[in-house]
């Protein structure tokens, strides 16, 4: 049996690579062959699944203090995660963040540095942001736009939110009060006109432009292409070729809900498996009832209890997959 292991991270308990290895151990224990393909959808973990960081640069953090951000440059392609420069974790989470002050300047500094070092193609992951500045600070930090002519910039998004909706949809998750959400929304509405005048680009109607508090829209204004992150990663790792001829595809994530099938890893991998006519198994930390009926789902919490599922996530993944393989 040939199995493709293509999970997302189990947030807080297992990286995508660790989850893929746990799946592979189960397959090998049952005499099969596993292909490990850790996945990401544009959120945290993008750099890791595309080869891992091989550069570290000191940049402006989300609240102004310097941070050291890892990123990758290989064969003229740079991979940058906004979370490593301007992420919510770096701001101290919801409790520590200052939503009106959080800045994407560090992302712009990374992009400038990547191009200065020779990148002609740049992939930028949007997930995990602390910011709702519409990308203005990033654009300012990037310097003269002329240096980006001829550079292909792909913005990997895991949401389809519009630019001016970013504060309302995601602001509370970043610690913004109702009053701050209104202020941030007004900021984004003004930036629509700023970008129209500066770049001749109307970002107000672009799907995905609200990703990372509007950073995606800011980058789109200067010429970047906004794409679904999971599809971009799938193309980079040639998931379609790996799935072809497989007997089973196993994916998973920490929590399964309706959004898992809307631009996230589980839904993306499921689509590739369906297109190839290959059975799919979804292993998750937990799941809501409605989402769980949309695929063959194994919940670690339901099978092993919450305490063990959290404390021994990788062992539980291996055991759950092995049990399901025995049933095939």
Language-model-detected regions and their locations in the chain:
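N-terminal loops that bind phosphate or other acidic moieties
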Residues: 1-328
